[in-house]
């Protein structure tokens, strides 16, 4: 049990170091209010080609699909939504983890991983969602930054 806890701690530390932005005002992020970064905890490497879908909750509490994409070789997705399209509200990002693990030759427990969050509750912000992924668990965190000036 102690070895597993140490592994999770080390993997989380590595993931946070990899997910930290080097240049907070990078050209690709200027008009990109929602970024995603995924790390495959088994390989200790970015999880490329993970499909994801972004939904926004309507006034009637139903979910409307507003964007979709796949992670690149670096395990990242940029330009999912423009600043103009990323309106205040509740969002759900659904990651197709089952398909990813099947392509890796592994069986997984979860069909999808989900992150539900409220955007712009305290003014306009930029969000980076980070996902640490293994076949039987996932951990998420978010880096929330102010609007680029």
Q: What residue ranges belong to the model's regions?
A:
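Beta-strand-rich domain onsets/edges
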Residues: 2-48, 56, 63, 138-140, ...
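Extracellular Ig-like/FN3 beta-sandwich strand-entry sites
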Residues: 31, 86-90, 124
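Beta-strand signatures of extracellular beta-sandwich domains
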Residues: 51-55, 92-94
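Surface-exposed loop/edge segments in extracytoplasmic proteins
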Residues: 60-68
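Glycine-centered loop-to-beta-strand initiation motif
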Residues: 70-84, 93
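A short, solvent-exposed beta-strand micro-motif common in secreted/extracellular proteins
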Residues: 88-99
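Short acidic/polar inter-strand loop motif in beta-rich domains
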Residues: 98-109, 138
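Extracellular beta-sheet/turn segments enriched in Thr/Pro/Gly and aliphatic residues
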Residues: 113-149
């Amino acid at each position: 049990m102690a070895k597993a806890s140490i592994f999770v701690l080390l993997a989380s530390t590595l993931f946070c170091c990899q997910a930290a932005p080097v240049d907070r005002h990078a050209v690709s992020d200027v008009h990109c209010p929602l970024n995603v970064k995924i790390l495959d905890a088994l390989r200790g490497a970015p999880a490329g080609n993970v499909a994801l879908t972004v939904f926004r909750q309507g006034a009637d509490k139903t979910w409307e699909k507003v964007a979709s994409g796949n992670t690149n070789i670096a395990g990242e997705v940029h330009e999912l939504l423009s600043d103009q399209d990323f309106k205040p509200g509740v969002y759900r990002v659904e990651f197709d983890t089952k398909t990813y693990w099947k392509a890796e030759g592994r069986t997984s427990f979860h069909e999808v991983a989900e992150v539900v969050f409220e955007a712009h509750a305290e003014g306009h912000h930029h969000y980076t969602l980070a996902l640490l992924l293994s076949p039987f668990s996932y951990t998420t965190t978010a880096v929330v930054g102010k609007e680029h000036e």
